[in-house]
Structure formats: C-alpha cells, structure tokens
C-alpha cells in the first residue's frame, strides 16, 4: 500500500509536469 501510494504520487507529479510542458 505504501509503495502504491508513493508510485501514485510520482505518477501525479509526472502528469502535472507533462500538462505544464504541453501548455
């Protein structure tokens, strides 16, 4: 569960960076 939470946070951060990059 902890691992999934960390991976989820990393995925969310990557999504935010990706969206900013697209903008």
From Swiss-Prot:
The coiled-coil regions, if any, are none
| Subcellular location(s) per record | Secreted
Disulphide bridges: none
Looking at the record's lineage, which domain of life comes first?
Answer: Eukaryota
User: In which tissues does this protein get expressed?
Assistant: Expressed in skin glands.
The free-text function statement in the UniProt record for this protein reads:
May act as an antimicrobial peptide.
Protein name, UniProt field: Septenin 2a
């Amino acid at each position: 569960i902890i691992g999934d939470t960390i991976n989820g946070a990393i995925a969310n951060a990557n999504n935010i960076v990706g969206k900013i990059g697209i903008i």
